[in-house]
Amino acid sequence: MVIFGLSRAIRKAKKNPIIAEIKVYSPKYGDLLRGRDPLRILRAYEEAGAVGISYITDQKYFKGSFDFLKVLCKETTLPVLRKDFITSKEEIEKTAEVGASAVLLITRILKDKLPEFVDYAKEHGLDTLVEVHTEDELKLAIKTNSTMIGINNRDIGKLEMDDGDVSLTEILAPKIPGKFVKVSESGIATLEDLKRALRVADAALIGTALMKAENPAELLKKFVEAEI
């Protein structure tokens, strides 16, 4: 594992930095894997030029598994982001132990514990993607030592069942200091969405649109190579 591998890869990217998500299930759209081998999707993402790979380990709502995260980290040289509803330091330790590069920390869940969890994750060599959805959450996030701040265009409190779009990124990203890598998450389905997001953010995290596509690699390649 390269220390802070994801934020470094985004900073150094020559093309559009897309964190491509292997998303098994969506509360809104149901089964996204549709019988496909997730490792074949991983290979497709690698070949199409993803800057990193995201995977949701939450089992209850997104049908992910920690065991597959372990497999993923062994199978790819790309930085891997673990997404989950992290509430304990033990989960951070486990994330680092299996070789992930980054961990999602949700401001709404951690609240006052956020700075402490960010520092703990960084001590373990992990990039921290601190997720925000409101201006008040952003005020908390920018007080931390996080390497990255993610703007979730959808409301995780509603399990992404809402129709959020990149307009939230356009509002919040300009308020984030340059020392943070800014990531626009969720609600990016078209080239126009991506262009709007990357005009104000450093990277985009895309899952549902890629997983719903008949040819995820083809769509990702289009996103990675698009003129912004």
Swiss-Prot record:
Pathway it works in: Amino-acid biosynthesis; L-tryptophan biosynthesis; L-tryptophan from chorismate: step 4/5
Disulfide bond residue pairs: none
The enzyme's E.C. designation: 4.1.1.48
Keyword Phosphoprotein set for record: no
Keywords noted in UniProt: Amino-acid biosynthesis, Aromatic amino acid biosynthesis, Decarboxylase, Lyase, Tryptophan biosynthesis
Pfam name, any one: IGPS
Source taxon at top rank: Archaea
Coiled-coil features, chain-numbered ranges: none
Top class in the EC scheme: lyase
SUPFAM superfamilies: Ribulose-phoshate binding barrel (SSF51366)
GO-annotated biological processes: L-tryptophan biosynthetic process
HAMAP family: IGPS_A
Family statement drawn from the similarity comment of this UniProt entry: Belongs to the TrpC family.
Protein name (record): Indole-3-glycerol phosphate synthase
